[in-house]
């Protein structure tokens, strides 16, 4: 039985972007979970990423899950200038913004949660502010990965604690949880490529990964 081709009106990503900061000190931090997401996807899809000066980032291309070409990008411009790299790729390949899927961290989502949307505001995220400014629209899909909020936050130390939380690294226990979350990210992206963002939204926006997952029943 042949697989049914996606309908023409479905939103299918062509460029998948992960947001983060390029210096080694930011590796594996909560704010760089977008970079980690792209690295995970590239590893599973066997796509080689290399620095591309024209695109101001690490860039790779492959064919997944069918014969269609897919582009992966990690902007190396620092977070608040991410849009420069994104627009460079979009302009070069003449891609509409609706084909750009951006993966990034979200404090308003608890750890263990994903949230796919077709469009929306930056929500205070500097990388997304830059992306929206350079693409000239909010009408492009995004995948937010929950990193949770810092505990015991106070009005006096709120901003400092927030920055420390965002730029801090996951604990060993949190890393185990995020490994499972990243597997979910790959699944959601692959479904988006096959059946569109809307289908992935319906299946993954209500999924929660817990620290002590219940064993799946036999299929």
Curated annotation (Swiss-Prot):
Q: Which organism is it from?
A: Trichodesmium erythraeum (strain IMS101)
Q: Which Gene3D superfamilies match?
A: Peptidyl-tRNA hydrolase (3.40.50.1470)
Enumerate the Pfam families for this protein: Pept_tRNA_hydro (PF01195)
Q: Which InterPro entries match?
A: Pept_tRNA_hydro, Pept_tRNA_hydro_sf
Q: What is this protein called?
A: Peptidyl-tRNA hydrolase
Any idea which residues are catalytic in this one? 31
Which GO terms fall under biological process for this protein? protein quality control for misfolded or incompletely synthesized proteins; rescue of stalled ribosome
- Site Stabilizes the basic form of H active site to accept a proton — annotated at 105
**UniProt keyword Protein biosynthesis, yes or no:** no
Residue(s) at site: Discriminates between blocked and unblocked aminoacyl-tRNA: 21
HAMAP family assigned: Pept_tRNA_hydro_bact (MF_00083)
Per UniProt, where does tRNA bind? 26, 78, 80, 126
Tell me the enzyme class.
Answer: hydrolase
CDD domains with a match to the protein in the record: PTH
Family label:
Belongs to the PTH family.
Q: Name one GO molecular function term.
A: peptidyl-tRNA hydrolase activity
The record's section on SUPFAM superfamilies has: Peptidyl-tRNA hydrolase-like (SSF53178)
Subunit structure of this chain's protein: Monomer.
Is tRNA-binding given among the entry's keywords?
Answer: yes
Taken from the UniProt entry, a GO cellular component term is: cytoplasm
Q: Which reaction does it catalyse?
A: an N-acyl-L-alpha-aminoacyl-tRNA + H2O = an N-acyl-L-amino acid + a tRNA + H(+)
EC identifiers of the protein:
3.1.1.29
PANTHER family named among the record's database cross-references: PEPTIDYL-TRNA HYDROLASE
Q: Main role?
A: Hydrolyzes ribosome-free peptidyl-tRNAs (with 1 or more amino acids incorporated), which drop off the ribosome during protein synthesis, or as a result of ribosome stalling.
Give the UniProt subcellular location, in the record's own words: Cytoplasm
Question: Where mainly found?
Answer: cytoplasm
Task: Please provide the record's keywords in A-Z order.
Answer: Cytoplasm, Hydrolase, RNA-binding, tRNA-binding
């Amino acid at each position: 039985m042949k697989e049914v081709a996606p309908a023409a009106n479905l939103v299918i990503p062509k460029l998948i972007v992960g947001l983060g900061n390029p210096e080694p000190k930011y590796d594996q931090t909560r704010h760089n979970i977008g970079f980690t997401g792209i690295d995970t996807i590239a590893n599973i899809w066997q796509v080689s990423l290399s620095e591309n000066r024209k695109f101001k980032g690490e860039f790779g291309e492959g064919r997944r899950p069918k014969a269609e070409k897919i582009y992966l990008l990690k902007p190396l411009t620092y977070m608040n200038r991410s849009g420069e790299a994104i627009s460079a790729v979009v302009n070069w390949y003449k891609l509409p913004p609706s084909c750009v899927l951006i993966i990034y961290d979200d404090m308003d989502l608890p750890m263990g949660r994903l949230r796919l949307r077709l469009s929306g505001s930056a929500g205070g995220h500097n990388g997304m502010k830059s992306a929206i400014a350079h693409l000239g629209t909010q009408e492009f899909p995004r995948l937010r990965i929950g990193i949770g909020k810092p505990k015991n936050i106070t009005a006096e130390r709120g901003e400092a604690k927030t920055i420390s939380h965002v730029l801090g690294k996951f604990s060993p226990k949190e890393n185990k949880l995020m490994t499972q979350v990243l597997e979910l990210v790959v699944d959601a992206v692959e479904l988006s490529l096959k059946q569109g963002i809307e289908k992935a939204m319906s299946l993954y926006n209500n999924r929660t990964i817990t620290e002590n997952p219940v064993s799946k029943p036999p299929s």
